[in-house]
Amino acid sequence: MNERPQSLDPELLIGPVKPPGTRETRLMGIAALTGAATSKGTSSGLGNDTDFALLNALRIWSDAVLVGAETARKENYFGVRTTAQQREARRGRGQAEVPPIVVVTKSLKFDTATQLFTDTRTPPLFAVPEDVLGDTEVSEHAREIEQAGGVIVPVEGEDVSAVVAALHARGLARIVCEGGPSLNTQLIGASEVDVFHYTVSPRAVQPSELRLFGEADTPSDHAFILEAAHTTSDSMLFLRYRSVREG
């Protein structure tokens, strides 16, 4: 039996990449053997150093980091961390120095004193259906967010494909989604995921309070092919699937 490495190069896990400016959406998720997507309340409790390195590498690859509102709140999101070398490399590729966190929300109800606003090099974006911006309460939240440095991104409609289209319209071609379950489910259901990075943690976590995917409103069945599978010495399994699209 071959000895497994303690860690893996995240670039190996990312695999082939298309030229900057080419539209591609990647989904990253981790789950225990029982299907649980969190341990002690956060997904970070399931991962190892390689999983964390993959998350950071996908952020550096991306033009936008997409996350659901509840996940951003629960996991106390902050801006993407980059080194001077990474920022220079991104400039050389024609990308912004730092990709923004993009929060998908319908309420715009956020505490602007949190590190999502205070600990970031680039303003967070908030993708919100444009038809709710006329609501008095939502409009007030939008004003508070903008005063705190955030950017409101009106979306034509409430489906996730409209969110992706709105980001593409802003020149944000490379998108990585970090959850949560509702957003993951919507992206998969709408066939918006091109590459799925799925990490399996060798732990049996009970109860499964939060899973990687939630209940879908509309049935869907989309095929993926396995591009790569790698393991580390602690039995963490890193899978990379690519969507099979007809035509």
Please give the residue ranges for each predicted region.
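Enzymes that bind and transform nitrogen-containing heteroaromatic metabolites
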Residues: 1-247
